[in-house]
Swiss-Prot record:
Organismal lineage: Bacteria, Bacillati, Mycoplasmatota, Mycoplasmoidales, Mycoplasmoidaceae
Origin: domain of life: Bacteria
Membrane topology field: Multi-pass membrane protein
Protein known as: Uncharacterized ABC transporter permease MG064 homolog
Transmembrane segments: 17-37, 402-422, 494-514, 518-538, 563-583, 592-612, 613-633, 682-702, 1261-1281, 1310-1330, 1349-1369
Organism from which the protein derives: Mycoplasma pneumoniae (strain ATCC 29342 / M129 / Subtype 1) (Mycoplasmoides pneumoniae)
Length: 1386
């Protein structure tokens, strides 16, 4: 046995290449598996740790309740007290039940304020809510009519507030009650987004008691529990005590449970307040005694404690602390009850490495921190400032102490917002604070975007979601087609950011695991083949020795066991190196995924057991293969083994090949015989060579394919950066109105023969400048202050902004703030943007003109952030007026006291209105600025505002516009046109087979540098736009569309169109609204990214069924090209498909507000004849005022049109009409006008990312495959030549030189190249086509990679270079041969 083993070891010299190759393959297989498998396991362990410890939610619920207007009307118990109330300031009033009819009055919730939510509350809890919707108040001893009116107005506010508070806190009415019944665990999720010096910071509220999505720590200490609940209770207690009056303080404290409040006040007073502290201590002692405080000797002088609850004292619950301010004589005093835990934060691990680079560290001295937290507020602040800055983080000027590093499971993949879907830890920072910590910052950034919702763990997810959604249909105000509750993995819901945050990580782990398994199996299969090759080669080379051994009685089993060395040594060495390297490379692998992985991950440590396991596994597998192959060969009889061993045996294929070359010389026939002598090895080697050339061909052919494709795609764009897709008009909506963005809200000039569009302009005659601003930018004083929620069309065609709307206006018996309702109709992020823009606007005004701006704008310095907050000074912006014209308008409906001149009107001051118009004009001038200056403007940068004003004598577009059926366009889009924007076009929403496509109807633009539309080119670079305008129903498609749908020039395209102008008419009568169209393909554009379709504007407009006179003037449009994003970032345009703009958020049959509005619209439309309306309108115009009643007839007609009913409407069928609106308009009164924006730069970047990612994957794959295949080719070819060594010795003895001998041996490469080429070329063509198809299917990029002659030659040269290594190795081997010795040994 020893001799057998020695013989095997001696053969290592001749099989060293094979052994190295086998060791290398085992090393790669084990190393790859260990590395990737451990990475997957480590990732999965970290992810599971966070999700299990943090209790990841499985559902999200978005709350939206319709409390309605909460408007109360008076039902008088006193015949003498029927005066029309006027607007008065909000003040505290004690509501009491009346003792007599003459001293009381009753307020009842108006019918159109009784939303379905309130009606549900009345059904569920009538005892509670009947007393809240009908409330009796007392005038007390007041007899003055003006004072009574003020009491009535204040009482309305109190009644509304009481009802609102009850509705918002009643769990039985809210979804939280449903969740409790379902035994779900849940919590409220709150986050605020803040941009701080170019860094996007997100603060998330988190409590240690959270049961869902709780904070999981990796380092440091947990956040302390906040005192927010306690603060809310203290605030409520103080309000109750103060409302009952300081004179009743003794009785109030005795009868109520206010010990918590008194103790909290006492705990936060300094020792200097000895008298006050003594009074509080006495109060605490007496609260449980039978005597009142007034009866005790110690409390007879009770002035100090009473001062705290005086009507002039204030108690605020802001910024995470309670602040009590009161007066003692002329001295103003202050007490702060604060929560020191509001200064704590935990940093997300994804940001922590970056923070550490900036020198930040976790504060570890928790005992010192706990001591500081026990100090009074002022001392705490001083001690807090002494802590080193390296332990703190800043949000603006607000400091937090870094206590730890941690994450909640919903932010494992930290997607920050809809626009920030790719995490960037340097510029996007995530911090956790408790509830008071959250309030501490949120109170200083009230206008910033926030995320809110309920996150829950539902026991039976699908069932519970159905239950909640069915409940929400009846109790929430979402449109019927939107779900309030959905799974956290529901990627179809665009609002579900949690899906983007949690679904990605499991997908990433599964992908890595799949790649690991595939790669390991592939490499192991190659290793098995190499093992077989080595064994077969060894056994054949040592046939004689094996035969002699068997003849001498050595068993085949022993011989076979000796062969195990061939698998044992490579297996052990390869496994050891592979396992060691795989373990050591874990951090490298984790870092490779650093763009996707943001939580700390522990790596697996080196394990002797792990090493032994992998070594044993590989050895067993390779040994099994070795034993099996050896058994197959060694089972032959000894005679057969020794027979003809010394002869060169030519295979049948070799003999047949020799016969084909019978007429050639002997050496030629000899070389042919050599080439075909080992058919199976030749076949395998040929396949490997073909595979090598195929992969090389693919690599070379696709090398620049992406760059070429991107170049072609970029050529289709000409100058524009953005493509906006808008809502498509209907007959009910009318055409979209457009304006220059900077002039949005102004009256623009139109030609006299222009078709009247959907906009109507409202006159404001009282201010001269308003003649230029009629659409209107500033509210029409009376119109929006009277019955604004009772008009079905109250928002129609009005351009608004917060600066022109945010005023509480009074007229007659109505007080309203138009902005409040407009804000509720905006998406939350746009409402926040509007509030932010409002601050920037006021700041800009102050910056460019401090004197004039200071007249109307108040600046308040935030003590925490040291930032200025700006607001309009209402005392200077508004005026009270008793105008004769207003009284005349009211006479027909006003009460007798109103006719006596008791009516007050609160309106904008004329000088202030002129001041606003001046600012709008400055913005209008700013619209003429260079687009570069506009697009790159930092609205919060004071110096940039100054520079802009100095350069253009104008303001940038700082005012955020809210428009209805109106869209602001950049000047380059309009291009000096009057009736239609030059670079506006029509998009047909079409269906081709089962695919949704977009066909763009473009105009015949002049194709020069000012053109913003596409320049369509063929592969020969011929511009073919004009073909659209010279042939009927012509369409140009791009190369991608031609490939995907197998189309060509001359083919026809049959589609269905879904956005026709008359589509609603069809839906109203339950007909199919789709239109059919047939196009003739007149050209193929060379763009290769995603299918594109272009037709002429006229063809598109005709197919969409717009009137011919509109088409001739090119008035309709639903898309446009631009170089500016401002129409989206600095404005909100809402579109109503129905043409209706009611003051409610949904069309639904159970929407009480909607049905009331429909009733009033029908009743108003029937009672106002056309003559009466004209008379009222003429009177209103003459007086410079506008009364909403003149809208009634128009509103009635628009409602008829929206419903598709030409006969008279019946107010008793309001519910039926609401059902029609819900069905036809999908439950949505309005939607965003802008439905899609295509960013050329973003598309190019996406294209580049896809290209780079694909190329990297391709390079990595080829980088692994090519070396392995070439190693096999080298191994097999070397083995083949080694087997011919005996022949080489004989040829050398016959006098042949080494080069001639080698050339003879290299003849085996001839069929390899010939057959390799024959196989590789067609398969390469197929592979390249398959590669193109895969990229096209997955990324919608059409690559035109093809196989050409230079590519084939280059691949052959590379393969020849690899095979030349064999030539060199054998040259060296032949030079070492000593003929006499070799003949003797043989």
């Amino acid at each position: 046995m020893r001799n057998l083993i020695k013989n095997v070891f001696r053969s290592f010299r001749t099989a060293k290449i094979a052994l190295i190759a086998l060791t290398f393959l085992i090393f790669v297989a084990v190393g790859s598996f260990v590395l990737l498998n451990n990475t997957v396991n480590n990732f999965n362990a970290s992810f599971q740790h966070v999700t299990e410890q943090g209790q990841l939610s499985n559902a999200i619920i978005n709350e939206r309740y319709d409390f309605g207007k909460l408007e109360f009307q008076k039902t008088s118990n006193d015949a003498t007290s029927s005066a029309q109330p006027s607007v008065s300031t909000r003040s505290t009033l004690t509501a009491q039940k009346a003792n007599g009819a003459n001293s009381s009055f009753t307020l009842t919730l108006t019918p159109d304020s009784r939303t379905s939510f309130i009606n549900n509350a009345l059904q569920l809890k009538p005892d509670v809510y009947n007393s809240l919707v009908t409330v009796t108040f007392s005038y007390g001893s007041e007899s003055d009519q003006t004072k009574k009116t003020q009491i009535e107005e204040q009482s309305k506010l109190i009644a509304a507030n009481n009802l609102s508070r009850a509705l918002q806190t009643d769990k039985e009415l809210l979804v939280t009650g449903q969740l409790e019944q379902l035994k779900a665990t849940f919590r409220t999720y709150k986050a605020i987004n803040i941009t701080d010096q170019g860094v996007f910071k997100k603060l998330i509220a988190s409590e240690p008691t959270d049961q869902v999505n709780r904070l999981v720590l990796f380092d440091g200490h947990q956040l302390a529990r906040s005192r927010q609940v306690e603060f809310n209770e203290l605030f409520s207690q103080f309000t109750q005590v103060q409302a009952k009056g300081k004179d009743q303080l003794s009785t109030t404290l005795k009868n109520g449970n206010y010990e918590q409040l008194l103790q909290a006040i006492a705990n936060n007073f300094g020792s200097s307040e000895t008298e006050l502290l003594k009074e509080i201590q006495d109060a605490l002692k007496q609260t449980n005694s039978s005597t009142t405080l007034a009866q005790t000797q110690s409390s007879q002088q009770f002035s100090k404690l009473k001062n705290l609850f005086d009507s002039g004292s204030t108690f605020t619950n802001i910024a995470g602390k309670l602040t009590l301010q009161w007066m003692e004589g002329t001295n103003k005093k202050q007490l702060v009850i604060f929560d020191p835990s509001s200064y704590e934060t935990v940093v997300a691990p994804g940001n922590w490495s970056y923070e550490q680079q900036q020198g930040k560290a976790v504060y570890q001295d928790i005992n010192h921190w706990n001591r500081i937290k026990r100090l009074p507020f002022n001392e705490f602040e001083r001690e807090f400032q002494k802590i080193d800055k390296r332990y703190k983080m800043l949000v603006d000027k607000i400091e937090y102490l870094i206590l730890g590093v941690g994450i909640t499971p919903d932010f494992v993949y930290p997607v920050f917002s809809e626009s920030l879907l790719i995490p960037n830890t340097a510029n996007e920072q995530l911090y956790y604070v408790n509830q008071t910590g959250y309030e501490r910052t949120a109170s200083s950034f009230l206008t910033n975007p926030t995320e809110t919702g309920i996150v829950a763990r539902l026991p039976n997810l699908n069932h519970d979601l159905d239950v909640i959604n069915q409940w929400a249909v009846k109790n929430m105000s979402w449109p019927p087609n939107l779900k309030a509750a959905y799974s956290n993995t529901d990627t179809t819901n665009i609002l579900n950011l949690l899906a983007a945050r949690t679904v990605f990580i499991p997908n990433l782990i599964n992908t890595i695991s799949l790649v690991s398994s595939f790669l390991t199996i592939a490499i192991l299969l190659v290793a098995i083949f190499v093992t077989i090759l080595i064994l077969v080669s060894y056994l054949k080379k040592n046939t004689e020795q094996i035969g002699i051994l068997k003849a001498n009685g050595v068993s085949g089993r022993k011989i076979n066991l000796s062969l195990l060395i061939f698998s044992l040594i490579p297996g052990i060495v390869g496994s050891f190196i592979g396992y060691t390297l795989g373990i050591s490379m874990q951090n490298v692998a984790i870092n490779l995924f650093s763009n996707y992985w943001f939580i700390p991950t522990q790596t697996s440590s080196f394990s002797v057991l792990g090493l032994l396991f992998f070594a044993l596994l590989v050895v067993l597998m390779m040994s099994g293969i070795s034993l099996f192959v050896g058994w197959l060969i060694l089972r032959q009889d000894v005679v057969k083994i020794l027979k003809h061993d010394s002869e060169f045996k030519v295979s049948h294929l070799g003999l047949w090949a020799k016969w084909l070359f019978a007429k050639f010389g002997i050496m030629t026939r000899f070389r042919v015989a050599l080439a075909f002598n080992a058919p199976w090895k030749l076949v395998f080697l040929t396949l490997m060579s073909a595979l090598t050339m195929m992969i090389l061909n693919l690599s070379f052919a696709t090398k620049d394919a992406f760059q070429v494709a991107q170049t072609k795609t970029t050529l289709t764009q000409s100058n524009h950066q953005y493509e906006f897709e808008l809502a498509s008009p209907t007959e009910q909506s009318g055409l979209l109105k457009w304006q220059l963005f900077a002039e949005l809200g102004a009256t623009d000039d139109r030609t006299t023969d222009a078709v009247k569009l959907a906009n109507r302009r409202m006159e404001i005659q009282s201010v001269d400048e308003s003649k230029k601003w009629k659409n209107q930018q500033v509210i029409n004083f009376v119109t929006d202050a009277t019955g604004f929620s009772n008009d079905i069309n109250y928002l129609e065609n009005i351009v608004q902004s917060k600066i022109g709307l945010d005023y509480s206006l009074g007229f007659g018996n109505v007080s309203s703030n138009p902005w409040k309702l407009s804000e509720t109709l905006m998406p939350a992020n746009q409402a926040s943007a509007s509030n932010t823009a409002f601050q920037n606007f006021l700041k800009a005004i102050i910056v460019i003109d401090p004197n004039e701006g200071g007249k109307y704008i108040k600046q308040t310095k935030d003590e925490v952030t040291v930032r200025f907050l700006y607001e309009i000074d209402s005392s200077k912006a508004l005026k009270n007026g008793n105008t004769k014209s207003v009284n005349k308008i009211q006479k027909s409906t006003a009460a007798p006291q109103a006719q006596q001149g008791q009516s007050n009107q609160l309106m904008l001051d004329n000088d202030f209105a002129k001041f606003l118009y001046k600012q709008f004009n400055l913005i209008k001038e700013g619209g003429k600025a260079d687009p570069v200056d506009l697009n790159n403007f930092d609205f919060a940068n004071q110096n940039q505002i100054k520079r802009f004003y100095s350069k253009y004598n104008a303001l940038p577009p700082v005012d955020y516009k809210l428009a209805f059926n109106v869209i602001g366009l950049p000047k380059e889009t309009i291009a000096n046109q009057k009736d239609a924007p030059l670079f506006g076009f029509l998009t047909l929403q079409a269906q081709l087979g089962n695919d949704a496509i977009k066909i763009k109807g473009i105009k015949d633009w002049k194709l020069d540098n000012t053109n913003l539309g596409p320049v369509l080119r063929t592969n020969e670079d011929e511009i073919i736009n004009q073909r659209l305008f010279s042939k009927p129903n012509g369409i140009i498609i791009n190369s991608s569309a031609a490939k995907k749908y197998r189309l060509k020039e001359g083919s026809q395209l049959h589609v269905k169109i879904h956005n026709g102008y008359k589509r609603v008419n069809a839906k109203l009568v339950n007909q199919d609204p789709t239109l059919t169209a047939t196009f003739n393909i007149v050209g193929i554009n060379n763009s290769v990214h995603e299918p594109e379709f272009y037709t002429s504007y006229k063809t598109a407009a005709t197919l969409l069924q717009y009137p011919n006179e509109w088409i001739e003037k090119q008035l309709p449009f639903n898309s446009f090209y631009a170089n500016s994003i401002l129409p989206f970032t600095q404005s909100t345009s809402l579109f109503s498909e129905s043409g209706l703009f009611p003051g409610t958020s949904s069309f639904a049959a159970n929407n009480t507000v909607l049905t009331e509005v429909i009733k009033k619209t029908i009743e108003g439309g029937k009672t106002n004849s056309k003559t009466d309306v004209q008379k009222r309108a003429a009177q209103a115009t003459a007086n410079g005022k506008y009364n909403s009643s003149q809208n009634n007839k128009m509103n009635y007609e628009r409602l008829q049109k929206a419903l598709g009913i030409t006969s008279d409407l019946d107010s008793s069928k309001a519910g039926e009409y609401a059902t029609i609106l819900e069905r036809v308009y999908d439950g949505l009164p309005y939607n965003s006008t802008i439905s899609f924006i295509s960013n050329v730069q973003a598309n190019d970047a996406l294209f580049a990312n896809i290209a780079n990612t694909t190329q990297q994957i391709q390079t990595a794959a080829i980088g692994i495959i090519i070396p392995i295949i070439m190693l096999i080719v080298l191994l097999v070819s070397t083995t083949l030549i080694q087997e011919l060594k005996k022949i080489a010795i004989r040829l050398k003895a016959l006098g042949y030189s080494n080069p001639k001998i080698l050339l003879s041996f290299l003849s085996i490469y001839l069929p390899l190249f010939i057959f390799g080429l024959l196989i590789s070329i067609p398969i390469s063509i197929y592979l390249i086509a398959l590669h193109n198809q895969v990229i096209f299917s997955s990324a919608a990029i059409l690559l035109e990679a093809t196989l050409n002659f230079p590519t084939v030659i280059l691949s052959m040269l590379v393969l020849s270079g690899v095979l030349s290594i064999t030539f060199v190795l054998n040259w060296l081997e032949l030079n070492k041969i000593k003929i006499a010795k070799e003949i003797k040994n043989s």
